[in-house]
Structure formats: structure tokens, C-alpha cells
């Protein structure tokens, strides 16, 4: 059934690529793991474990396997259920290997779960800039063009005013967490900390 579903939503003409994709999905579900050694245990093959892992690696490194192109038709169909709805999207990130790599993901919030819309991998530590996430945000905006309103949520790691400016450009509302000592420049030129403005927590 997974194969049939993928064939109905994805234009990939090479059936072998679709079949390999299906078995990777099955491996993810049955193993409850993203580790290739665990996924490979659920791939039917006469090869030993190392051979099955190599098979998955070859599929992942195939130049014709572009993850966004494979994922986009699936998420586009899923998002039809949110047409004309008000939605919330969450940007979060994590790092691995002593911050050698940072992963950023923009997800649709739904029933205390996060449905991935777009993602980005960045080398090295440090705060991410909105310029580096431009493609990620634009991809999500394209996917969400049928919804009524979008509210962007992020923590204090994305507090730069450029993020707010980008949200306004996309016609998104936004709620970006900031530290209570963050300075705000008023119309008269004064710079005051947020905690001196009488703003209640959560507002």
C-alpha cells in the first residue's frame, strides 16, 4: 500500500527508486530508529547486514534522489486538509558532533506534534541568520499558500529583528521569544529593556 500511495503522488518514473524508498520507510517504522544498521534489518535481501546497509547508502547518495523533491508531493497533499485554516509554524534547531553541524527545521504545529515542512543543515556553531534560512522560509511559504493565516513561532535564538522583518514580508504573524532584558528602541529614541515596559509574560 505504501508503494501504491507513493506512486500516486510522486512523478518519479524509476520504479526501483520508489521501491527502495518504500523499504527505507518500512525500516524506519519497524525499527523505530534512524540508524541505517537498524533500518537495514527490515530490508528483504539475501545480502548480509553490511550489504543491506551499503544498499541504503547507495540509494541515499544517488544524485537523482533529491530529498525535497521526494518529500514535497507528500506534504503538499497532506496540507490540503489545512486549506483556509489558521496555522502555527515552529522553527527550532539542534546541533550534533560538538556543534560541527546544526539542523534547523520549520514545522507545522498540530495536536502537540510537529509536522516537518522544510529543513536546513548548516556547518559550524553560532546563531543562524535569516539570510541562511531564506530558502527554507520561502519553501514553507510556498507550501502554505492555501492556508488562511500563518503565525511563526521561535525561541530567543531567532530574536534578531530581521526574522520579524522576513515574517512581515511573507505576510506572517510572529511570536519570537526574547530575553526580558532585550532593548527596545521607542519612537522618541529611548532604548528600554522589555521588562520595564509592563509587558506581561506570554504577550
Q: Which stretches of residues belong to each language-model region?
A:
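Electropositive nucleic-acid engagement tracts
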Residues: 2-85
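Extended interaction regions within the primary functional domain
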Residues: 5-8, 18, 109-112, 123-127
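Short, contiguous clusters of charged residues that form electrostatic/catalytic patches at enzyme active sites
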Residues: 37, 73, 88-89, 131, ...
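Short, conserved catalytic/metal-binding motifs centered on acidic residues
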Residues: 39, 88-95, 106, 114, ...
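Structured nucleic-acid-interacting core domains from mobile-element enzymes and related host factors
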Residues: 65-115
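An internal, acidic/charged active-site-proximal segment
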Residues: 121-203
Amino acid at each position: 500500500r505504501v508503494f501504491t500511495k507513493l506512486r500516486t503522488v510522486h512523478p518519479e518514473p524509476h520504479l526501483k527508486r520508489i521501491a527502495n524508498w518504500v523499504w527505507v520507510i518500512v525500516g524506519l517504522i519497524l525499527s523505530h530508529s534512524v540508524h541505517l544498521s537498524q533500518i537495514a534489518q527490515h530490508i528483504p535481501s539475501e545480502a548480509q547486514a553490511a550489504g543491506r546497509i551499503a544498499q541504503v547508502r547507495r540509494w541515499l547518495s544517488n544524485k537523482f534522489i533529491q530529498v525535497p523533491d521526494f518529500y514535497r508531493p507528500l506534504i503538499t497533499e497532506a496540507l490540503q486538509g489545512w486549506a483556509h485554516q489558521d496555522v502555527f509554524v515552529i522553527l527550532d534547531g539542534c546541533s550534533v558532533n560538538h556543534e560541527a553541524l546544526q539542523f534547523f527545521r520549520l514545522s507545522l504545529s498540530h495536536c502537540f506534534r510537529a509536522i516537518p515542512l522544510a529543513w536546513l543543515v548548516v556547518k559550524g556553531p553560532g546563531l543562524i541568520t535569516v539570510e541562511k534560512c531564506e530558502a527554507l522560509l520561502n519553501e514553507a511559504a510556498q507550501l502554505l499558500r492555501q492556508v488562511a493565516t500563518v503565525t511563526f513561532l521561535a525561541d530567543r535564538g531567532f530574536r534578531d529583528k530581521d526574522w520579524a522583518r522576513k515574517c512581515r514580508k511573507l505576510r506572517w504573524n510572529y511570536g519570537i521569544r526574547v530575553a526580558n532584558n532585550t532593548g527596545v528602541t521607542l519612537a522618541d529614541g529611548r532604548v528600554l529593556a522589555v521588562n520595564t515596559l509592563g509587558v506581561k509574560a506570554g504577550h
